[in-house]
């Protein structure tokens, strides 16, 4: 979709991002993004009309919002790589047929390429969610690790992975250790189910192959 002069460098940069260790991304979020979110981003969002439902209470810096941004950066290579494969897998004959019928470039993208790659893009998003569920180190560094249900995106919180990382070493023998193991079991089941769903969508991608209908253009 992007021009060739931009697609190459951009793809390379995103592929290199996948090789960055999660702890490095976590340190970047902790040392670079946390001060920016505390002093600029979250106070600005609280001033936008209608956003007060999502950003209320004191601003801490480490928060659900910051952890979401860090996770988005970490899962971006997965989404881009699989989506790129799905988009390139759309039959060239379908694209040429659409253009032969007078479709513009963006009509071909909207009516042929995106419908043909829809299941692959869904699979990419599903697998990215699976990776986000299992991420723990980077999230634990930026989410604040408060064991309570947050009522604001600017408030600290905890995920299953971050709770396991922070509590396992200090869990009391017996009930404490059992609770952490139960969290790990729940996380394992969720991750397996989400990744299985993504793999199933990838397997069914061929059935979603688009056919161009001139009347729709």
Named regions from a protein language model:
Residues 16-20, 24-25, 79-84, 90-91, ...:
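Transmembrane alpha-helices
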Residues 4, 104-105:
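Short coil/turn motifs that cap or connect alpha-helices
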Residues 190, 194-217:
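Cytosolic-side transmembrane-helix boundaries in multi-pass membrane proteins
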Residues 27-73, 144:
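Membrane-interfacial helix termini and adjacent extracytoplasmic/periplasmic loops
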Residues 13-20, 33, 69-79, 129-133, ...:
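Hydrophobic transmembrane alpha-helices
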Residues 19-20, 121, 128-132, 160, ...:
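Hydrophobic transmembrane alpha-helical segments of multi-pass transport and channel proteins
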Residues 139-188:
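Interhelical loop and adjacent transmembrane-helix boundary motif
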Residues 1-29, 95, 208-217:
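Cytoplasmic-entry segments and transmembrane alpha-helices of multi-pass inner-membrane transporters
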